């Protein structure tokens, strides 16, 4: 079975070697047909503590690392202006 890969925005980087990634998806309401944004948060493993809040990253499903972490950060897709300002 292939590993799932998702793209999302980092909302928290406070944990040691852990980031919380918010993944949004769009679904159609079953009755009214309106497109609705749904989101889910995933705890992901960041070995080098290199990822900061506000950045867009890709995460990959992996074997359980801890109670909450079953995802790991693959790479950084883009850096937001908020994260750039925090670095300066």
Swiss-Prot record:
<comment type="similarity">
    <text>Belongs to the universal ribosomal protein uS17 family.</text>
</comment>
<comment type="function">
    <text>One of the primary rRNA binding proteins, it binds specifically to the 5'-end of 16S ribosomal RNA.</text>
</comment>
<dbReference type="InterPro" id="IPR000266">
    <property type="entry name" value="Ribosomal_uS17"/>
</dbReference>
<keyword id="KW-0687">Ribonucleoprotein</keyword>
<keyword id="KW-0689">Ribosomal protein</keyword>
<dbReference type="Pfam" id="PF00366">
    <property type="entry name" value="Ribosomal_S17"/>
</dbReference>
<dbReference type="GO" id="GO:0003735">
    <property type="term" value="F:structural constituent of ribosome"/>
</dbReference>
<dbReference type="GO" id="GO:0019843">
    <property type="term" value="F:rRNA binding"/>
</dbReference>
<dbReference type="InterPro" id="IPR019984">
    <property type="entry name" value="Ribosomal_uS17_bact/chlr"/>
</dbReference>
<dbReference type="InterPro" id="IPR012340">
    <property type="entry name" value="NA-bd_OB-fold"/>
</dbReference>
<keyword id="KW-0694">RNA-binding</keyword>
<dbReference type="GO" id="GO:0006412">
    <property type="term" value="P:translation"/>
</dbReference>
<dbReference type="GO" id="GO:0022627">
    <property type="term" value="C:cytosolic small ribosomal subunit"/>
</dbReference>
<keyword id="KW-0699">rRNA-binding</keyword>
<protein>
    <recommendedName>
        <fullName>Small ribosomal subunit protein uS17</fullName>
    </recommendedName>
</protein>
<comment type="subunit">
    <text>Part of the 30S ribosomal subunit.</text>
</comment>
